[in-house]
Amino acid sequence: MKKAAKIVLLVVLLAIVGGIVYTVLTWPIYPQPRKSVDSYQQLRQDMEKTGVLVPPENVLPWVETFYSQELDGRDRLSKPMAFLMSGTVEYGGASYWTELYGSREWNYDRSMEVPLRENYRMTPIYRDASDNSMLYFLCIDGHIYTVQVYADGKMPQDAVDYFDGLLLEACHTVVDLYQ
């Protein structure tokens, strides 16, 4: 009888320890499925595992840059599935918020609504614009990339022309990564 009691006690203790370990590993530690990354090198290294290629740090003439990753969950076991490089770019004495986003999943269904800007190396690049923002996006090897700029008010025409060329060149840089 003592041997059976010891086995039952051991099974109960293992179940408790297993429950604690599972809770620690799966307890949400990120308030959102996104986390900040300290450096470009860390971002690039983390994203290599996903197959999503990160363009060079100077793909846009950033004044200041922030890096973050979108995660597939909120717990300790979450893995990166997308990245965001964001910051300000200055033109004509004004600062414009810019973002470059790359994801391993095509979850962006705007290609039917947005006009095609051009095909670059057999990759369609789409462009959408409003008075205070401009968006370019493309899909290559199943990965989606978006590059966008925002203004505080209506963008002057010279800024529109500048960012039109700048964002398109950033898209070309992304496509060239896969060549």
What are these regions (language model features)?
Residues 18-33:
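Membrane-interface motif at the C-terminal end of an N-terminal transmembrane signal
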Residues 27-28, 48-53, 153, 179:
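Short, flexible coil/linker elements and helix-boundary hinge sites characteristic
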Residues 23-24, 40-43, 47, 160-163:
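Long, compositionally biased, charged low-complexity segments
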Residues 1-20:
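N-terminal Sec-pathway targeting helices
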Residues 108-179:
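A short, solvent-exposed beta-edge/loop patch
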Residues 33-135:
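Short, solvent-exposed recognition patches
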Residues 3-4, 14, 81, 93, ...:
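Residue-level detector of intrinsically disordered, flexible termini
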